[in-house]
Swiss-Prot record:
Keywords: Heme, Iron, Membrane, Metal-binding, Monooxygenase, Oxidoreductase, Transmembrane, Transmembrane helix. GO terms for cellular component: membrane; plasmodesma. This is Cytochrome P450 71A20. The chain crosses the membrane at residues 3-23. Its EC number is 1.14.-.-. Its cofactor is heme. It is found in: Membrane. The keyword Transmembrane helix applies. PROSITE patterns: CYTOCHROME_P450 (PS00086). GO terms for molecular function: heme binding; iron ion binding; monooxygenase activity; oxidoreductase activity, acting on paired donors, with incorporation or reduction of molecular oxygen. Belongs to the cytochrome P450 family. InterPro entries: Cyt_P450 (IPR001128), Cyt_P450_CS (IPR017972), Cyt_P450_E_grp-I (IPR002401), Cyt_P450_sf (IPR036396). It is a single-pass membrane protein.
Amino acid sequence: MEMILITLCLTTLLALLLKSILKRTATKNFNLPPSPWRLPVIGNLHQLSLHTHRSLRSLSLRYGPLMLLHFGRTPVLIVSSADVAHDVMKTHDLVCANRPKTKVVDKILSGGRDVAFAPYGEYWRQMKSICIQNLLNNKMVRSYEKIREEEIKRMIEKLEKASCSSSPSPVNLSQILMTLTNDIICRVALGRKYSGKKDGIDVENIVRTFAALLGEFPVGEYIPSLSWIDRIRGLDHKMEVVDKRFDEFLERVVKEHEEADKETRSDLVDKLLTIQSDKTGQFELEKSALKLIIWDMFLAGTATTLSFLEWAMTELMRNPKVMKKLQEEIRSSSPQDLFVTEKEAEKMNYLQAVIKEALRLRPPAPLLVPRVLSEDVKLKGYNIPAGTQVIVNAWAIQRDTTTWGTDAEEFKPERHLDTNLDFQGQDFKFIPFGSGKRICPGIGFTSALIGVTLANIVKRFNWRMDVEPQRVQHDLTEATGLVVFRKFPLIAIPSSA
């Protein structure tokens, strides 16, 4: 009996190996990009670390800026240079505008019925248009300036309490910044702040968990026969919890707005409900889609902004000369006791250079949201078949020494002075928010918040990290996820300037 089982196992393994070899031989005729040797069944999954952007960059240094990997049976094109990114997101933008289906998106975002993950087409265009017209256009972004100012001032008051004593106490700056971004997006999108203690829901934790889930690699997604591993890892349970909790929260928010005075509608939910009730339009906004728009606003408005502010403050405290130079610019441009306005922040050259450098070195989403080819395409002389997923490694591109110089790994805002380089997606060596049709539509909203926040906390306080005496270096460990936060909170000590 044992010999029969052993024979069956060996036969199965040999069959898989033979199938893999035959498939690899057959694909040679397609003139595919360079690819590392892959294992049967799992493909190249064994070559990925928890910090996928780093392992993909290491592979690209060996196999080139355009390489083909296989996640299980799924072919995935990895883009790691500005030149190839230009071809993907400009030359072939329309062919590369679709999104692949994923387990997390299917479960939490109704199969990609939101803006960020919806398939390219009329539905996506209508949803994106609703977001831009009602929240993300320049006029709307400017109209929320007072909300941003009020919440930043509240944050400064909290920090002043920690800094005013003769012995300033450490603060969890990560948590303070998370509360700031969450409160602002709640007021803008939902009309009021939602506190976990007061309202019985921890929105901040849900957003963090969801951002982490989006960066997961569910084994069952690429190897269906091993989907049981996701259950053992607790991935399926996490998705269930996030989906249930946030849906309950959004149901309550929508109900509150439906029962409120309809004559005073002004926030995003109010506007979405007005659109939903209008049956004369060409596009009917379903309730589920309405909630998914709010989901996107939380992910983009809270997660990406927090990630930037966390890492920007980390780099400034690691580079005291840069911090001092920035403080000198801000403090000389604005009286110490006054709030730095958004217009003032926009005119501060070194501040803008610091923002660009932080986005270059620490893009909130190191790997841009994956795309999938809708038809065959030719890239750099290689033939890429339809259905291939495309991942642009913005983190690797923005640290490429061939375009940024030998000091690309260093935090040097000076590299952005006296240049017209911006992050609007037109220069493909600097694409922290993507480019082309699927560029992040919330760039303006995020930009308005990060500049004024950074200006005011750097102006009002002197900062240093709360580092244990025995530690020589600052902790720069990254969390995992689509949006990459610090793994451990940024604990810092503010002192009055």
